[in-house]
Amino acid sequence: MNLMLMGLPGAGKGTQAEKIVDAYHIPHISTGDMFRAAMADQTDLGVKAKAFIDKGELVPDDVTNGIVEERLSQADTNVGYLLDGFPRTLDQADALAVITDKLNKPLDGVINIDVDPEILADRLSGRFICKTCGATYHKLYHPTQVEGTCDRCGGHVFFQREDDKPETVKNRLKVNIEMNTPLLDFYEKRNLLYTVDGNQEIDDVFAAVKKVLDTIKD
């Protein structure tokens, strides 16, 4: 099966990707891993990508698309693949369609893990850190045993990273929703989109994902 995974930050894509890869024995291809491998192997495209990344610039589409094509050309994707983090734009989605047709590895399905943005905001903005020892907690999922006291060192001073502050999280989600919506429409029009309710326990989400994948497989 040739698959793509979509979802907003905090939706649990990484966890579901691991479960899909374990159950269906297909390679997990994330954008970050692709770039790191291309740069480590010093391919022509990897060298080009590194030059942009080192300058703190976005890697242009032609380089990104080329790296994706190189990765999907590798033999381990002959049994299928799970794309994660690409495409990010409609232009990249068009390029991916051309690449996968050329390689005769077209997408069989796009799985969107749909979670209420309010729940995601709570998930992402609930993290706090002990200033003394750096132990990490979450107000909902991993609170301190005694309120206001670090389990590890007994410290009483905590802080939040800028990235985890509610306003930052809300802006990040807003940007991602604006970016994802056209892509979801793109794949829905091509009858490739399958949306799974991600507002459930991890195993329940995977059960729903598996049901979709078994349908695609058949």
UniProtKB/Swiss-Prot annotation:
Family: Belongs to the adenylate kinase family.
Annotated region described as LID, given as residue ranges: 126-164
Annotated binding of Zn(2+), by residue: 130, 133, 150, 153
General function of this protein: Catalyzes the reversible transfer of the terminal phosphate group between ATP and AMP. Plays an important role in cellular energy homeostasis and in adenine nucleotide metabolism.
The reaction(s) this protein catalyses: AMP + ATP = 2 ADP
Annotated stretches, region: NMP: 30-59
PANTHER family per the UniProt record, alphabetical: NUCLEOTIDE KINASE
Top-rank lineage group of the source organism: Bacteria
Protein's name according to its UniProt entry: Adenylate kinase
Any one Gene Ontology cellular component term annotated for this protein: cytoplasm
NCBIfam families given in the database record: adk, PRK00279.1-2, PRK00279.1-3
Transmembrane is among the record's keywords: no
Biological processes per GO annotation: AMP salvage
Keyword Transferase: yes
A GO molecular function held by the record: zinc ion binding
Cellular compartments annotated: Cytoplasm
Residues that coordinate or bind ATP: 10-15, 127, 136-137, 200
Binding site for AMP: 31, 36, 57-59, 85-88, 92, 161, 172
Record-linked HAMAP family: Adenylate_kinase_Adk
EC number: 2.7.4.3
Subunit structure of this chain's protein: Monomer.
Record note on domains: Consists of three domains, a large central CORE domain and two small peripheral domains, NMPbind and LID, which undergo movements during catalysis. The LID domain closes over the site of phosphoryl transfer upon ATP binding. Assembling and dissambling the active center during each catalytic cycle provides an effective means to prevent ATP hydrolysis. Some bacteria have evolved a zinc-coordinating structure that stabilizes the LID domain.
